[in-house]
A protein has these predicted regions:
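Bacterial N-terminal signal peptides that target proteins for export
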Residues: 1-9
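Gram-negative bacterial Sec-dependent N-terminal signal peptides
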Residues: 8-17
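N-terminal low-complexity, Pro/Thr/Ser-rich intrinsically disordered segments
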Residues: 23-53
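Second-shell loop/turn segments in exported
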Residues: 41-46, 118-126
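A cross-family detector of function-defining hotspots
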Residues: 52-105, 124-170, 176-179
């Protein structure tokens, strides 16, 4: 009888362990990757860090020349930023980190992507209008921050930052940029 009870408890423990491992495997989203800093628009994709040129501007149907927003300091160096706007999104190009990445001062990259409407989504399917539950399921629980009354949930990979503005438990804006 003792052997039966011991075997029963061992079997029960193993089954519970395997079940809990299976549940964890299904509920923990994959770690953030470089691909998470891209969007698909008009069946074309652009990503943070892509070289800014006529082809990229054409993909998202904005002029190559943007509106100058100013020089913004990163690590004590000022970099030039330009905004390229359309209804669904804002893309910022800059010569960010040209000096550290062995590029010419006039070589520009996509340095920020801001999604303003539900037309665009992240590679994990999150878009403006997604719920906080969908966000947590896709990315996990991120770093929550209240900035001047606005709630943001953020995820970092190296110097890249993926942020979601939340209002009434819904995603209302998505931003991908370089952390400063």
């Amino acid at each position: 009888m003792r052997k039966f009870i011991r075997a029963y408890f061992c079997f029960s423990f193993i089954v519970c362990f395997l079940y809990s491992s299976e549940v964890v495997a299904h509920t923990v989203p994959p770690a953030l990757r470089e691909l998470d800093f891209s969007i698909a628009i008009n069946k074309k994709s652009i990503a943070l860090g892509d070289r800014w040129d006529n082809d990229v501007a054409h993909k998202i149907k904005v002029p190559t020349e943007g509106q100058f927003v100013g020089e913004i300091p990163f690590d004590g160096v000022n970099y030039k930023f330009y905004q390229h706007h359309q209804a669904e999104l804002d893309v910022f190009s800059s010569n960010l980190l040209w000096d550290k990445n062995e590029r010419n001062v006039n070589d520009y990259i996509v340095s920020q992507i801001t999604i303003n409407s539900g037309e665009c989504s992240t590679p994990r399917g999150i878009h403006v209008g997604s719920t906080i539950e969908e966000l947590n399921k896709a990315y996990g629980v991120g770093q929550s921050e209240n900035d001047s009354g606005e709630q943001w949930v953020s995820y970092e990979l190296g110097i890249k930052l993926l942020s979601f503005k939340i209002k009434d438990n819904m995603v209302v804006k998505i931003s991908m940029n370089y952390a400063n």
